[in-house]
């Protein structure tokens, strides 16, 4: 694992603008809101060569981690190379205010060498060899199915749903995607990936505090490395980034709930799809909603356009019983509202193009290892999971955000499986909000 902080420098066109460090910016703007001096008078106290003394002169509240001040640092960029897919998932779950990107699965090395060591992850020593064996066999299954599906797509190009007049380079890319999108369920959740995030110092402090409070050695190691980079740009606010009792206790309870449910439901049999959608449209008696859903939606030119209050005030909660981790990694990045999963294996998804019986021994051994880790109460059971593991997943948000997600995740370029999940959620949504059907653009996940 390698963690790197990136420092922004102004472009040449901004050479004449006042210069501040992230925490100096927070101090200046905090003072700006607590005086009537005007910006020029405050900036006159700034010595960019000595930002710490400048902060002391302007406003020291930045020391105390006040949320209203810690968010004024602007975005701090951090890149994490070589973290497990699980840790990348967890960081996106925690860092809800961050802008970020993770390496696309198609660019990741699919090899047992591209996985952290058992020691780095905290896998119990006596189970390490079994875990390494599962990882190696899982990658072998991935490569075997990928090669078979790629050859099948060459022999039967209609399977790929190629656009008319597609150029050879596009044909090759879509064929490779066809194979990857179906073979990926054998990829270990422990596989290394990379991610980069940008968020304020305040939110970084919360993220690192949360990571430092988790029982996973990898998470705590990441917390220490991120903190070491943050100190270079935001030393005062980084003081508030250490493990804290409430975070540790909630993490302990979360793990206990996952272990209990995970052992009760552990299975490698695919779960039939179930979806649950709850729409809440009640309003305060003194602030009724008067706009129609049609009027809230019919002025949009695309999914990024503004929606009206009829959908923006509507609360929508939705959940699936069997979201494979492969799809969950994408849906987890929708930042609005709250997302929750116990991260268990209640079933195992394979597309119809793959015969489960051919991999029955691998999945039985993988499930046995997961059970052993769970029975020991080990948080490292997550590293025994493959991307085909199916877990319940819940997301609560507002109507406009749900509609955006449904249109995005069924639209062009969407993976066929999460398009299935969002289409099912849309059907349940339309049953409760039928007037939205004419205005929501449900896609067909055509390749791009």
Question: What are these model-predicted stretches?
Answer:
Residues 1-448:
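A conserved ligand/cofactor-binding region detector
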């Amino acid at each position: 694992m390698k963690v790197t902080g990136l420092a922004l420098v102004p472009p040449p066109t901004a050479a004449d603008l006042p210069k501040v460090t992230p925490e100096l910016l927070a101090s200046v703007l905090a003072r700006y809101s607590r005086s009537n001096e005007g910006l020029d008078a405050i900036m006159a106290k700034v010595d960019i060569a000595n930002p710490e003394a400048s902060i002391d002169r302007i406003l020291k509240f930045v020391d105390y981690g006040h949320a209203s001040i810690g968010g004024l640092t602007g975005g701090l960029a951090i890149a994490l190379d070589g973290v497990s897919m699980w840790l990348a998932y967890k960081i996106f779950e925690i860092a809800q205010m961050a802008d970020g990107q993770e390496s696309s699965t198609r660019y990741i090395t699919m090899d047992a060498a591209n996985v952290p060591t058992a020691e780095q992850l905290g896998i119990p020593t006596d189970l390490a060899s079994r875990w390494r064996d599962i990882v190696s066999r899982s990658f072998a299954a991935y490569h075997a199915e990928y090669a078979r599906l790629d050859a099948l797509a060459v022999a039967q190009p209609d399977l790929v749903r190629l656009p008319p007049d597609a150029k050879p380079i596009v044909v090759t890319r879509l064929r490779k995607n066809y194979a990857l999108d179906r073979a990926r369920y054998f990829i270990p959740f422990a596989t290394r990936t990379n991610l980069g995030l940008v968020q304020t110092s305040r939110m970084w402090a919360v993220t690192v505090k949360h990571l430092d409070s988790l029982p996973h050695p990898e998470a705590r190691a990441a917390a220490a490395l991120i903190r070491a980079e943050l100190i270079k740009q935001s030393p005062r606010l980084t003081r508030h980034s250490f493990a804290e009792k409430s975070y540790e206790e909630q993490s302990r309870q979360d793990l206990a709930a996952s272990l209990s449910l995970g052992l009760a439901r552990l299975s490698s049999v695919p779960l039939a799809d179930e979806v649950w959608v709850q729409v809440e449209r009640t309003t305060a008696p003194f602030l009724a909603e008067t706009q129609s859903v049609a009027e809230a939606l019919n002025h949009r030119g695309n999914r990024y356009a503004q929606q009206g209050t009829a959908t923006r005030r509507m609360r929508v909660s939705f959940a699936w019983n069997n979201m494979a981790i492969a799809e969950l990694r994408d849906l987890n990045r929708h930042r609005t509202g709250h997302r929750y999963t116990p991260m268990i294996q209640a079933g195992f998804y394979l597309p119809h193009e793959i015969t489960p019986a051919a991999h029955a021994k691998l999945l039985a051994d993988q499930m046995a290892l997961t059970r052993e880790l769970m029975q020991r109460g080990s948080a490292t059971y997550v590293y025994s999971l493959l991307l085909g593991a199916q877990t319940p997943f819940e997301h609560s948000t507002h109507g406009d955000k749900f509609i955006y997600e449904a249109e995005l995740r069924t639209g062009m370029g969407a993976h066929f499986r999460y398009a299935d999940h969002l289409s099912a959620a849309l059907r349940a949504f339309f049953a409760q909000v039928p007037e939205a059907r004419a205005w929501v653009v449900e896609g067909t996940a055509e390749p791009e």
